[in-house]
Swiss-Prot record:
Oligomer and partners: MCR is a hexamer of two alpha, two beta, and two gamma chains, forming a dimer of heterotrimers.
Species for this entry: Methanocaldococcus jannaschii (strain ATCC 43067 / DSM 2661 / JAL-1 / JCM 10045 / NBRC 100440)
Binding site for coenzyme M: 368
Similarity comment text for this entry: Belongs to the methyl-coenzyme M reductase beta subunit family.
Enzyme class label: transferase
Gene Ontology molecular-function annotations: coenzyme-B sulfoethylthiotransferase activity
InterPro entries xref list: Me_CoM_Rdtase_asu/bsu_C, Me_CoM_Rdtase_asu_N_sub2, Me_CoM_Rdtase_bsu, Me_CoM_Rdtase_bsu_C, Me_CoM_Rdtase_bsu_N, Me_CoM_Rdtase_Fd-like_fold
Cofactor: record remark: Binds 2 coenzyme F430 non-covalently per MCR complex. Coenzyme F430 is a yellow nickel porphinoid. Methyl-coenzyme-M reductase is activated when the enzyme-bound coenzyme F430 is reduced to the Ni(I) oxidation state.
Name of the molecule in the record: Methyl-coenzyme M reductase II subunit beta
Domain of life assignment: Archaea
Amino acid sequence: MLHYEDRIDLYDERGKLLEENVPLEAISPLKNPTIEKIVNDIKRSVAINLAGIENALKTGAVGGKACFCPGRELDLPIVENAEIIAEKIKRMVQIEEDDDTVVKLINGGKQLLLQLPSKRLRVAADYTVSALIGGGATVQAIVDAFDVDMFDAPVVKTAVMGRYPQTVDFHGANIATLLGPPVLLEGLGYGLRNIMANHIVAVTRKKTLNAVALASILEQTAMFETGDALGAFERLHLLGLAFQGLNANNLTYELVKENGKDGTVGTVVASVVERALEDGVIRPLKTMPSGFTVYEPVDWALWNAYAASGLVAAVIVNVGAARAAQGVASTVLYYNDILEYETGLPSVDFGRAEGTAVGFSFFSHSIYGGGGPGTFHGNHVVTRHSKGFAIPCAAAAMCLDAGTQMFSVERTSALVGTVYSAIDHLREPLKYVAEGAVEVKEKEKVI
């Protein structure tokens, strides 16, 4: 059952048509099978750093920074026996022989991807089951494989799971999940927003439009969870996901191509307005005595989607020219500011993206200046305020950064990137979401 008449064409990151005449709802998290799979796999997956565990035990440096326990070292050939450990983990975690449990060794056994059977999530209250089961199974597998006694077993636990439960998170652990502990969420329903931009960039291997897509999918899917993408506002968020996140109608790609060589934030604004007029998304309302034209939207939600596509294009053009991510906050701020002055229309997310950028600028490189753009996420107290339209810009910026950041992708997200990028639909969401949309299109018998 389709509620909206909108149709879109889906393109990949190179401007190649993937599928045309797609119903807007075919990219909805409630209908698209790939997006459902992305969310489910994020919840049930945990990255386990076997090489990190081995090194921590060998040196006695367990439990995070500055924690060193002389005399508690254990020299265990964990990576060498990775296949044995993986098999033991699988036996503990798997429920049925034919269930969807995945245990995959990566990088010569240095890392391991564990995906819990979906049934374990269905009988759990929240998604931390993946970290707790994954960590617990790894501890038991190592203890069993190397016959570790009761006095050294706690050291193994700390090498695997860090200081938890002395801390509410897994501080100093050698396991990692994309979703942080629920106790750290800024509000109800913010779980999918609690993934820093650097993680998204690492998972998509710095492919800009795929990083934008994954960030947008997570942010906009969260809007369905929080009750924002509901009723009168559902179409607004679906169009935002389509145009800003999934390069619908190739708009983002074309805006970047048009302005990439010698364009600025201002020329991107001009291109967006021109395209919106051509496509009948906005129209002139009146001309002032000064000659200034005030516009009105023909379609409010579609105007927001065009503006959001232009926003990420402006970030790509501006940050891409500098090859420095630090400018993303001011680009988000002044793109929206210029757009409002140029048209008399509301900017992206009806001002929330612009307002978010003010705080984003302050906390990323103003007087405070404590965090680089890549460390921010939709659950952050600074960047939570936009309803899904700001974090895709931060992800785009970090893809284009040429190593200027203290909090680089390599520093914050190496394990996450190595392990989670092995999941195809997380690494290349544009391609696989389009395939999912085709399934919906065929099911709904759309020609």
